[in-house]
Amino acid sequence: MASSAHSDSASSDAPAELPAEILAAAPWSAPADDSEHLRITAVRTFLTAPQGCPYVIVRVETNQPGLYGLGCASDPQRTLAIRSVVDDYYAPMLLGRDPADIEDLHRLLFNSGYWRGGSIGQNALAGVDVALWDIKGKVAGLPLHQLLGGRAREAAEAYTHVDGDNAGEIAEKVLAAHERGYRHVRVQVSVPGTDTYGTAPRDAAEARRRELRAGSWDSLAYLRHVPPVLREIRERVGTGVELLHDAHERLTPSQARELVHEVEDARLFFLEDALAPEDAAHFDQLRAAGSVPLAVGELYHDVMMYLPLLQRQVIDFARIRVPTLGGLTPTRKLVAAVELFGARTAPHGPGDVSPVGMAANLGLDLSSPAFGVQEAATFREPTREVFPGTPVPERGRFHGSDRPGLGVDFDEVAARKYPVPEPLRHDRWALLRNGDGSVQRP
């Protein structure tokens, strides 16, 4: 585990002078005298897949022995490109710089490409940015939530996922999750004859079709089938547990309005991604269609994409994804805006967000008055082996770590046991088709 503080004394923990080759490779404005200051000496990326999904982990190292920071830059669809951005573009600009200057370094990297933004650059930037916050916490001897203002709550409520073919099966799973302590449960319903998002395949043949994304989608079948099932689930489980549902941006604006109207009686905690980012202009009409709380944002790659929706008060939950938004530096500002406009946060946290990314989420969750609910991934034993300190919910809540920084470490040796799949598939979200053969949003 990295040291939690640094000293200016001559002890073994004192920052060492940077090697000449580091200074030679450092950018034009990096200070030449590093003997008394903490400096970045290396930026390294690691690819690992302990759960099958590729993680991109960034480690920012310093001239203080044992002091480093970790960041999550994971986007399973653009893994190699993100690694290249960090290694080939960002790392050379960071050598020799002070890791404490997080705001300045974020602006430096963000503006370095001239054509700014986009998922690849933002995820790469997030890996560096979160690692710098991790270093800052270790130097200060404080956990992330304390750096962000301190605890606003004892623990962060989490939601888990269940799915099934019918209301009886799903309701039984919801009640079982409630017995385990979860007060919020996302429910996904299999639609016969379609490749339904968020549901388990029924057999090996369907699993193979899903792997190849060779299935088809039928929005009208979804609209006929899902609302009655959601209403029946609510009748079966009562009002003691909150229900969530994800439409996963597969509907047109008019279909989304119909869905909002039809699920009113299911009394959802929120309806997620009823509209794709490209259709965000239709949120006013969606809001007018009913009183169902609306959640959106996991696909947004710029915090400014949220601002018009917050200003018009047409969304209730911001589904922030820290890696895709460029890290904690911009996301903490978004969280403040969410609070000011009376909405709540519901950070994205499925299996494609590493334990490092989940720890970043929890820093925001525990410190923000605007927090609503945290999506909870199930991190299996191989993942916990690679990431000592992996956040794990207890009775449906994340209590967070009081260790300095993120509170999560990375075992490089263990990570090598779980290489990313080869060859990597980058087209799986583009292979779903409508009945007429046209490409369907994922």
From Swiss-Prot:
Alphabetically ordered keywords of this record: Magnesium, Metal-binding
The record's annotation in PROSITE patterns points to: MR_MLE_1
Pfam families in the record, alphabetically? MR_MLE_C, MR_MLE_N
SUPFAM superfamilies annotated for this entry? Answer: Enolase C-terminal domain-like, Enolase N-terminal domain-like
UniProt-listed InterPro entries: DgoD-like, Enolase-like_C_sf, Enolase-like_N, Enolase_C-like, Mandel_Rmase/mucon_lact_enz_CS, Mandelate_racemase_C, Mandelate_racemase_N_dom
Report the record's Gene Ontology biological process terms.
amino acid catabolic process
Q: Where does Mg(2+) bind?
A: D246, E272, E298
Q: Which GO terms describe its molecular function?
A: magnesium ion binding
Where on this chain does D-arabinonate bind? Answer: H248, E298, R319, H348, E375
* UniProt keyword annotation of Magnesium present: yes
The task this protein performs is described as: Has no detectable activity with D-mannonate and with a panel of 70 other acid sugars (in vitro), in spite of the conservation of the residues that are expected to be important for catalytic activity and cofactor binding. May have evolved a divergent function.
Query: Hey, which family's this protein in?
Result: Belongs to the mandelate racemase/muconate lactonizing enzyme family. GalD subfamily.
- What is this protein's name? D-galactonate dehydratase family member SSBG_02010
- Please tell me the species this chain comes from: Streptomyces sp. (strain SPB074)
